[in-house]
Design a protein with these regions (language model features):
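Post-transcriptional modification and biogenesis factors for structured RNAs
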Residues: 1-210
Length: 210
């Protein structure tokens, strides 16, 4: 019989200071919020971004920005550890990130979206050989980490990612859903997608050790 389990104490969690956090290696992932209106959601995205070591959060358009009591409350102060920047227009952030070598990904339900479970962000050239052009994004013929950088765009609570931004993206990524609503809160979507990329990154690093 397995021994009794227990919750970890706060001192056992391996938490780092804001200064140490900023010294950690970059993940190659940034989050772009396209006119997200809720300060609570923005704070939640900061909190999730801190957990998965997102390099930066871009707050675009009408997004609330720090300092904000609601952002601070829902984010547990993560806006102090995760770098952020405000852009008046999401397209300005998109073009800048493209010029910096990021693959631009809209997290949105579209006609040609790639389902998240089929997305392999850190697949090597060899693992993608023999893949059809239509499924190129699903295998990510891109070279191993850390050569690939992703800008993940999450949209407004009502309208989602704007069509202009979708058009400017390299591809769209969709979270498979099976219920009646086919709608997740933006902060929940961010958590699902960021965990997927984190899991793939961990798998890639573990495979390289074999």
């Amino acid at each position: 019989m397995q021994g009794k389990d227990r919750k970890l104490l706060n001192i056992e969690l391996g938490r780092v200071s804001s200064e140490k956090y900023r010294e950690l290696p970059d993940s190659g992932i940034v989050v772009v919020l396209d006119n997200v209106r809720s300060a609570h959601n923005v704070g939640s995205v900061f909190r999730t971004s801190d957990s998965f070591k997102v390099d930066k959060v871009f707050l675009c358009g009408i997004c609330p920005v720090p300092p904000s009591a609601e952002i601070h409350k829902s984010g547990l102060g993560a806006e102090d550890s995760v770098g952020w920047e405000h852009c008046e227009d999401t397209m300005v952030a998109v073009e800048r990130l493209r010029n910096e070598g990021y693959t631009i990904v809209s997290v949105e339900q579209t006609v040609n979206s790639v389902k998240l479970d089929r997305f392999r962000p850190y697949a090597t050239q060899e693992s993608a050989e023999g893949t059809s052009q239509e499924s190129a994004a699903e295998t990510s013929n891109i070279g191993p980490i850390p050569s690939k950088k992703y800008a993940l765009i999450f949209g407004n609570e009502v309208d989602g990612v704007s069509q202009e931004v979708v058009d400017a993206s390299d591809f769209s990524l969709e979270i498979p859903q099976f219920g009646m609503k086919h709608s997740l809160n933006i902060s929940v979507s961010a958590g699902v997608v960021l965990w997927h990329l984190t899991l793939e990154r961990l798998r890639t690093k573990n495979a390289e050790k074999l």
